[in-house]
Structures are given as structure tokens and as C-alpha cells.
């Protein structure tokens, strides 16, 4: 707990009343001796000054006045006549003194209000009535108990008679619910309840055989419950009484080691009680249950008084005889604990331990298990995602809260508008949407946009656009007006005055005939052709003689079919009408030549000629770039009429760009509106969106300025809704496909994406999560601002990730072959065993030689290292067993019972194989021998025992020879994983680097198990690849893996750890004690304990015959160990083998909000199945089920923090979860084994939980 302030006084104290800044009044404790042996007594006021952040500092009094005697008790209460209240002191000389607190603070000399001496002895206790602050009760020697009225202190009346009691009243307390009830406690052990109204005793309690009472306290809420304490060293008890049964205490609180001197029951929370006493301790209790929450920092002397702050119970004060009153909080920041830990660690390493031990700060050893009652909210509410409001309130008549989840709309119109629009979109009624928006639009720009969008819905949108622009009837009207006009003969013949020839117009790149669709020209020629052979009455002459030379040249050219020469003559003579007539007969080339000549001549002519040239030359870009913007409608009409489909969008966009540039330069909104029309016609969403966003802001600002009762949020949401509706309908009409959804940056529609994201947030906050998800799907996958929104939507809707691995084939049921390691030693080859044969020698029978041989030792005599210090490198033909997690398959039992005597040895490991060995049937299904992490007995339905059928080439077979463990065929490449068999060893090698050796005793996991029923031990999750497993007690007929040092487990007790040995001390070799120096390689060992392994890196101190190394020849006798030698295959250095501290987790345990999408199926399926199992599991297996759930939570924490598990492992776990979900437990077990075999580094305690869940789920109906 945090020490806020310290008052350097040995004094009784009281808190200031009211909610103002807290003060403490102190009176020198009667009978206490100061450090300077002064006999002066003072009343002092202290300002705690909690606004100052200097914690634990000693204070100076702000007011001080001398008194005639020391204090036994002091009280401070509010008063109507005194601003800061009245302070009452119970003095040792029997005087009751009252002071004005305000005058004391101001330093006035008349601060003493009155001094009364009704008591004949010292006043031991006093207290103001909590309901009537003018009433003051005082108790003292000889059983004197007075009730005083501050309005007339001299007229105090006494309760009880003087002759009845001769003991002293040590404490008293007013009832907190019934103001006229008072309780007193005396030194003779009487606890008396008084009725002040009647001035009589109501009840007397026998305090546990009349033991002295040091403190009493009423329950702040229940008027019939009180607590008393005993100050005796022999009975340091706190008694809880219920007056409805006063014969015996309801509860006894035991925790103090010496007498209890003071009690303080928290007025704001009846579940908190403070006590202090002669054992220098202050303890916090729950008096309702009798449990002690813990104790506060211990001081060096008696703590004789403790008090909660009456207004702010977050802090309290405790006075002790070490000369300090400590003000501290009940909340702990843990800062002091860390500092104290550093100081303690420093003191341990220092020589002057006892010197520093006294200065070491005491720290709190507990935290409150629940929040105090004053921090509990009677009602609370919180807005949740998706338009939800979570509220909690107290149920009537109880402290239990009722949680309610309800829906909330910030603006109800948002939800209705969204629903109506989305329903119209689903039905495809886009024309109805446009019509309703046109009718409801309030600004002209909005209405124009919807009209254009409606026009685009027609079957011929380009024609409808021309009609919308007003060009549908203008041509007919112009033709009618011209027909009414009279034209002269020359104009009618097309021979009007032409402007001089100009060279301002260049030849167009692409020229086509303007007469290609001229119906009148075609009919004219048809009429001429049809007159062939007909008799006419209109004769003519080809040459009249009056024609010009040009006419003759034209005639001759026509007669010879030389239309091009005739055309040239016409053009030279400037006879354009004749030239066009000749060009019609001369073909396309002549027509183009005539057109070019015409346009060149008419470059300065009427504007329609320029337009006609653009149309004929299919060069509408000239109209787009050069036509005046005042005639943009005419330009867009020409584009709609003559442009081909490929150029149409680009032409409209270019015209819109010119209009928008005009808007930017002249700030003319009409130009922006016209540009919007062009962009809509061109279906250029990225261009029109920027204009619509500008209009959205302007319309929103205008609406806010003229709003009467709408909020700014509602206005903004309506404008945003209108924008989204226009974009959505326009996308449908134009069949827009966003080509940039796969890009990672530089999006053209980034402004639209922002609005989509904002709209999704708005509709999601109104509970329309499906609509929000729809618009979020329109954003690019790599849009960074959408990641949070997508994850919130997905979490709120509980949808699995899109990439859930459900369609993949199940994982193989056999792990791949472990890699073969190459070493420097070449062991002898193991003879190939293919079964018994007549006359064959049993190679596994115990040899007749007394001197054993090592099948894995080199064939030639080489130098060796001493036992216990052997270093080696694995060879090509054999890999040491790798550490594994679970699913260890022990070898089956031998066919014949083994002998109980004879030399012992361990079976050699199986040979390495280039193929993956098949997984045999689980051991627990083949036999009744439980493994360490199997389902508890009786959890599932009992399986019908049957004889398993061996699988060719994969199952483990028993040895046909007696007295031998079973082996697989070495040459079949189907041996089980190396970790299922123990390594060959005759000695006890050093344990893994971390952790000292276990004691000289049998492994806790195997002690007490009958022979042949030893379960396989779980190896540690991580160890070095060259660290050999430790030796283990073995049983006859079965090769059991050695014990592994491991952490606490719910299935066995942790081993006792002896002190570490000197890692560099030489081995202490002792003489053999009647046993051979070595053992046979195969013979079963006797049932005995192995000697304990040494500490890390220390040579083995032998207590029995020196055992040989599996990679060195056996010694012939006791040898002195050589000095340590560094070899290639030696154990890594200490620094390398030290286990690194686990990294700090990003998120607290239990948090599931950050599980990635690809891991969501794992969490959802496994947690759901765990709850199903938990609900149906038998009560006898509650502990196992809870442990499985705890281990699964470890997995979920890893997934939430995105650590430990690789993406491939998460994918495999998703397949496993899916297999559990569809009840394909065989596949789930195969995937589990595959992960366990190939990804050992990622497995931990959680993997055991997954295995158990598979079994429990299978057994649970």
C-alpha cells in the first residue's frame, strides 16, 4: 500500500469531518514516553496536503496548543455553531475539553470552548453520536459513562449506577442505525448495550469468559451485529456477535499473534474491517466471512489505534508506539513492492545483511479480491459497437446486478432511411429511387444529378441525354421556319456568294463522305438509270457550240469516264455544286477531294461548316477542345450524336474537365454543375465524386446554418446518406467496376473510400452491421483505415475468416523421419533380426561372459573419457532420442516374464530410417496402461476389449524371445520414432543444463506403480538436441524412458531439488560395491533406483560401480577422471544453454479481441466444444476438465498475441478444429500427432489440452 503521509507523533488521533481537504487532530498519548523523555502534552492539527505529490513525507503541525494532561482518546465532529467543527479530548486527568477547530487553525487564544470534570478518573473513550453531533458519550474509570450535550456540557447525565461497576470502560461505540443505542466494553470483560432513551442497560454480553475488551464496533448496516476484541496476548481474538443470539459469538477472527488493541469498521463497506494490536500488525478483514484479506506493512512497535477516513475510505491512518502515525491507502500501485524487491536483492548480496535489513521497507502482501463497495456503481451504462447499449443496475432488494443489452439509435431516421434504400436496391427499383429523390431534393444541383442518372437508365441513354438538353424539337422547328422563308434563284441552286478561298484549314486526317446516307442523291441517280431505253420528247445536244472551254473539258472527261479530271476542272473553275455532282459519280476518292476543297474554301464561313468538318472527319476532339464553353450543351449533343462508343466517355470527360477548370478559375457554380453532367454522361465516377463531395459539404453547412431543431449529426448523416445513394445508384447504372481494388496505394477513389468508411461506421453504430460490411467490401483489401472496421464487424457478427481451412485433405498419420545427424564415431552395426529360425542363436539372450560389451562402442580400442563427463556426437547410424511432448508410444510388454535378478541393461534404440514410420495404434487403446496425460479412468464409455490386428510394416511387434524387450525389424524401415525408445546407457550422464538434479529417490510419477505398469514420462517441451535424457527407475521386461525434470503438473508433485554442486569440481570415484563394472546391453534391469545425476557440467561422483558411456569402451576398473577437455560434440556453454526469459505479452491473458481472422475458427470451435464437454462431464472429473480448459486458454492467449505459432501451424490447427467440429476424431488425432512431431518448438502446455479435448469430445455424447 502507498504511504501518503507520516506524522511523527506518539498520539491518539481523529479525522476531520466533512468532505473538505482532510486534517488530522492528534493528542499526546497518555502514558507514552517520547524519545526526549518530555512530559509535555499537546493538541495538534495536521494538514495532510494531499495535493502535494511527495509521498511519505513527514508533516509539520499547522496548529498546536498545550494541554494539562495526556489523551486517551480524541474525537472531531461537525457543529452548527462552529465552522470547522468541535474537537473533544478525553484526558488522563478526567477532564473533557472541547476546542473550536477553526480558532485553533487561526491561532486564536480562546480556542478552548469548555472543560468539564464530571469523571472522577481518567476518561478512556469518547465518541460523538453519528446522527446527533451535539451528543457526546464518554466512558472512563470505575464504570463511569456520561452523555453530554454540547449546548450544555455541565448538565451531562450518567448511565448506570456507580455501585454496579468498579471496572473501567475501555471503549464505546454508537449504533449506526439506531441513534439512541450505545455499546461499551470494559476491562472486566463486560460488553454492555445501553438504551440512552431509557438510560438503562438493554443487554450484557459475556466476552468469552469475561476477557477484557479493548475495542467495540457496530456493523454500519445491521443494527444487531457488533464486533469486540481481546487485548490479551494469550487470546488475540476478534469476536463477531449477533445480538439475536447473545450466548456465543457468531464468528471468531483469528490472525493476530498478540493482543488486539483497536478496531475500525468501514462505514461505506461492511465487508472491510481494520484491526491492529500488540503484534505490530494492521490486518484487513472481511467480517462477514471471517477471512483476512491480508496485512499492511508491519512496524517496529505496537499499533494501538487505526481509523478509516470517514469521508474517503480509500485511505486510513494507524498510530503506533514507534512514534509515527502513518496515513496510507488501501490501493497498491506496486511501485513500493518493486523497489523493495531491489533493495532486498541488494541486501542478500551484501555482507552487512543485518545492517541493511532494518532499513529494508516493508511491502504489502495482499490485494483486495474485489473492489470496495464505494467503488461499485449502483447503475452504469456503456455504449457498445453495433448500436448496442449495455446497462447494469441493482436488482430490487439485493446487491446483485442485472445486465441488459438493448439497441440504441443516435438518429432513428438513419435506420429507416438505410432500410428503405437497401430494400429498393435489392428489388432493383432504381428508377423509383431516382424519382423519389428528384421529388424530395431541395437544391437544384441535387435534382439535376438525379435527373441525369435517371436518363442513363433508359435503353438509349445518349439519345435521352440529347433530349434532356432540349435538342429534340429544335431541328424540326428550324426546318419549319426556313420553309416559310423565300429564297432567290441563286440561293436555291446553291450558287450564292461564297467567301474568297482561304488556306486556313488543313486537310483532315480522316475524311468520309457526307453523302453516304444521302437518300435524295441515291434516288436521283436511280431516276436517271431508270430512264434508260425510255422514249423521251426532250432531245438535247452534247455540244451546243456555245459552251466554254471548261464545259468542253468536263464533257470530254465524263465521256471517257475520267471523273477525277472532270472534278479538277470544276474545282479550278470554282464550280462547287458541279464538283460535288461529279464527285458523286466518281466514287469515294473524288468525294473526299471535293469535301476537302469545300472546307478549305469555307474556313472563314459559317460555324456549321467547322462542325460539319469535325463530324465528317470524325474529329470531335476539335469540338471538345475548341468550342466555346457557352455552347457546351451543343458540344455534348454533337458528341452524343456522332461519337463512337469507344471515344464517347473520353470526349465527355474532356469537356467536363474544361468546365471544371472554368469553375476553379471563375468560381462559377454553374460550370461545376455542367461539369458534373459531363462526368455523369461519361460514367467517370472518380471525377463526379469529387464534385459531389464538395456539394455535400456546402449543403451540410447551409442546412446547419438554417436548421431549427435538427442536430449537426443528423444533418451530416442525411447529407452523407444522399451522397452514398447517388454513388450506389450511379455505380449500378454505369456498371462501374473498380479497377484499383487490388492496388496498395495511390487510389483515384480515395476520397470515396473515406466516405464509404465513414458511412459504414455510422450504419454500424445504428446496428446495421450487414450494410456496413457491404460497403467495407467495396474498399481495397489493403486499405489501411479499413482494417479496424473490418475486424470489429467480423468480431461483432462472429463470422469465421474467409480463409478457413476446411477443404484440405487431412494431415498424414505419420510424422516424417527425423534428420540423421553425422558424428565422428562409427558404432558397430546392429545385427539384422528377421525372426527366429531353427538352430539360430538368440542374440538377445544374456551373454555368458562376465565382462559386458557395448554394442554402440567403437570396434577398436580408443581413449575414453571418464564416466559422467562424456562428450559425444551422434553417429550416422543412430540419432539420440529427441525430446517430445506427448503421444509417446511405449514398447509392448515381453511375451515371457523376465527374471528378477541378474545384471541390468537398457534396450538399444531403433535404427534410423529414411522413411517415415507409421503410427501404431495408440497405446492406451491397445492396453489398459494409462499414459500421463490420458483421459481419467471412467470418463468415457468403456471400450470392448478386443485383439488388435497388426498392420503390416507399421505396427510394433513383440519379441519372440524370452527375457527381452520387443524390437521392430531394423531392416523394414518402419521403426517407431526414436523418442519412443530409451537411449542405450550404462551410466548416468549429466542432466540438461537448466535445473539441478533430483534427490536420491524414485521419480514421483512412477513411485508406487506395479512392475510392468510404468507410464511413459512426458519429456520437456524444449531441450538441446545433444542433451541425453536422464536415467529413470526401470521395471523388468519394459524399457521405460528416463525421468525428465519438469515444472509443476496437476498429475504429480514437483521433485525436491538439492543444492547445486560445484560445476568444476573433479569427480570423486569410489570403489565398486560388489557389482560389475558394466551391464549387458539387453538384459532387463532389476527393480531398483538409480543414483542421482550430478549438477550441470559437473563430473559424476560415483557411489556405485562406475558406469560406462554409451559411446566409449567400458572401464576395467576405477580410474581417475582426466581434466575437462573441450570436444566438438561437447555440451554447449552455460550462456548458450540458459533459457531466455519469455517475452512480455502484448495483450493480457484472457483477452480474445485480437485473435487474427485465420485463427478465429480455432478459438470458436475449440472453446465451443470445451463448453459442451464441461457442461456434460461427470462431476468426478471436474478437476481434469478445468485443467484442460486452462491449457486451451494458453493456446488462445498465444493466438491473441500472435506469438509462438507459425502460420502453417495455425492452418493445421484450423483443420484439427474443423475435424473436431465434424466429429472426425481420427483425423484430429493424426493432425495433433503431426504437429507434435514436426513442430515441437511451438508446442507447450496447450498441446496437452488439445489432446485431452479430442478424447473428452469423443467420449462425451
UniProtKB/Swiss-Prot annotation:
Region (Disordered): 797-1156
Residue ranges, compositional bias (Low complexity): 852-879, 912-922, 1100-1110, 1135-1148
Membrane topology: Peripheral membrane protein
SMART domains given in the database record: WD40
One Pfam family it belongs to: SRA1
Main subcellular localisation: membrane
GO MF, one example: structural molecule activity
GO biological-process terms attached to the record: COPII-coated vesicle cargo loading; endoplasmic reticulum organization; protein transport
Domain of life: Eukaryota
Ranges of compositional bias, category Pro residues: 889-911, 975-1001, 1039-1061, 1081-1099, 1111-1125
Key words of the record: Cytoplasmic vesicle, Endoplasmic reticulum, ER-Golgi transport, Membrane, Protein transport, Repeat, Transport, WD repeat
Disulphide-bridged cysteine pairs: none
One GO CC term on file: endoplasmic reticulum membrane
Localisation: Cytoplasmic vesicle, COPII-coated vesicle membrane; Endoplasmic reticulum membrane
WD repeat feature ranges: 5-47, 66-109, 118-158, 164-204, 208-251, 255-295, 298-338, 382-406
InterPro entries: Sec16_Sec23-bd, SEC31-like, SRA1/Sec31, WD40/YVTN_repeat-like_dom_sf, WD40_repeat_dom_sf, WD40_rpt
Compositional bias annotation for Polar residues: 946-974
Subunit structure of this chain's protein: The COPII coat is composed of at least 5 proteins: the SEC23/24 complex, the SEC13/31 complex, and the protein SAR1. SEC13 and SEC31 make a 2:2 tetramer that forms the edge element of the COPII outer coat. The tetramer self-assembles in multiple copies to form the complete polyhedral cage. Interacts (via WD 8) with SEC13.
Family, per entry: Belongs to the WD repeat SEC31 family.
Protein role: Component of the coat protein complex II (COPII) which promotes the formation of transport vesicles from the endoplasmic reticulum (ER). The coat has two main functions, the physical deformation of the endoplasmic reticulum membrane into vesicles and the selection of cargo molecules.
The protein, known as: Protein transport protein SEC31
Provenance organism: Coccidioides immitis (strain RS)
Source lineage: Eukaryota, Fungi, Dikarya, Ascomycota, Pezizomycotina
Gene that encodes the chain: SEC31
